[in-house]
A protein has these predicted regions:
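Catalytic core of pol beta-like nucleotidyltransferases
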Residues: 1-24, 33-34, 38, 51-102
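P-loop (Walker A) phosphate-binding loop of NTP-binding proteins
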Residues: 30
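Conserved histidines in hydrophobic membrane contexts and catalytic metal-binding motifs
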Residues: 27
Length: 102
C-alpha cells in the first residue's frame, strides 16, 4: 500500500478513530517517508481527547483498539504512540517524517 493509499484509508477511518477518543492522528517512519518495505509496520502518533476521561488501563486498552482499527482498515501491522508520552529527542528525530492526518 502506498503512502497516499494509507493516508486515504486513515481519513476514511477518521470517524471510527474519533469515536475511540482519538483527537489527532499522524503517521511517521518508513511508511510516511515512502521508503517502506512490504513487511514494514505503520507507525502512528495519536492524541486522545482529554474529555474522553481515559486513564490507566482504559487508556492502554484504547491504544490497542486504535491499533486494531487501523490494522483492519489498512491491512498493515500498526504501532501507535501517544504524542504526549514520546521523548523530546524522539520527537525531533521523527519531525521531518511526520504527516498529520487529522
Amino acid at each position: 500500500m502506498t503512502r497516499d493509499e494509507i493516508i486515504a484509508k486513515l481519513k476514511e477511518t477518521a470517524p471510527a478513530l474519533r469515536a475511540e477518543g482519538v483527537s489527532r492522528l499522524a503517521i511517521f517512519g518508513s511508511r510516511a517517508r515512502g521508503d517502506a518495505r512490504e513487511d514494514s509496520d505503520l507507525d502512528v502518533l495519536i492524541d486522545i481527547d482529554p474529555n474522553a476521561n481515559l486513564y490507566g488501563l482504559a487508556l492502554i486498552g484504547t491504544i490497542g483498539d486504535v491499533q486494531r482499527t487501523i490494522e483492519a482498515a489498512t491491512g498493515i501491522s500498526t504501532r501507535a504512540e501517544m504524542r504526549r508520552w514520546i521523548e523530546p529527542r524522539f520527537a525531533e528525530r521523527i519531525a521531518d517524517d511526520l504527516i498529520e492526518i487529522f
